[in-house]
Amino acid sequence: MSKESQLEALVAACHWIGAKGWAPATGGNMSLREDARWCWLSESGKDKGSLTTDDFLQVDIATNLAPSGRKPSAETGLHTLIYRLFPEANCVLHVHTVNATVLSRVEKSDALHLSGYEMQKSLAGQITHLDDVPVAIFDNDQDIDALAERIARHHRQFPLRYGFLLRGHGLTCWGSDVAVARRHLEGLEFLFECEMQRRLLERA
């Protein structure tokens, strides 16, 4: 699929995310890899439910700079980190869902462990509900460079897959193309909803 087609697919995914209420108040950011050097990242302060292809800025993966001079999203450094860590990643979605935001605060360990859910198989490479699927949780930080370094350091010891949570902030996930990243987002959000309900019912 051409870059233009993939960017149109990403815009459609952004509209879907906006309709779900998963990126409220202009929150969240989305990107698409162009090649080894460049990616296209949503511009800061834009409502994700009404983005167009013109709202994506070309960004240098190595430097985080946008040649246009326009301001890319605040978490640019996390998107470019993922593209550097995962050559197979071609789309990154960062959302602020209620489930991801709350679960990342309730879970006090450094990972949310998912097991026993059939929908784990929505994640690439997962073939059984019996596996333990850890989703790493990192403390939120306004210093994105420092946060990116912590994530990279963690990945060197405990390789990341699919996505990670920022505590009290949201979910960042990725995939080999827009469709896979979107499936990972939808699958993880479903699993987070199940986990929220399970914890609430167990406390009742």
From Swiss-Prot:
Alphabetical UniProt keywords: Amino-acid biosynthesis, Lyase, Metal-binding, Methionine biosynthesis, Zinc
Listed pathway(s): Amino-acid biosynthesis; L-methionine biosynthesis via salvage pathway; L-methionine from S-methyl-5-thio-alpha-D-ribose 1-phosphate: step 2/6
Entry cofactors: Zn(2+)
SUPFAM superfamilies, alphabetized: AraD/HMP-PK domain-like
Catalysed reaction, written as an equation: 5-(methylsulfanyl)-D-ribulose 1-phosphate = 5-methylsulfanyl-2,3-dioxopentyl phosphate + H2O
Gene3D superfamilies attached to this UniProt entry: Class II aldolase/adducin N-terminal domain
Superkingdom, natural source: Bacteria
Gene Ontology CC: cytosol
EC number: 4.2.1.109
NCBIfam families: PRK09220.1 (NF006672), salvage_mtnB (TIGR03328)
Function: Catalyzes the dehydration of methylthioribulose-1-phosphate (MTRu-1-P) into 2,3-diketo-5-methylthiopentyl-1-phosphate (DK-MTP-1-P).
Name under which the protein is recorded: Methylthioribulose-1-phosphate dehydratase
Organism: Cronobacter sakazakii (strain ATCC BAA-894)
Gene name, Swiss-Prot/TrEMBL: mtnB
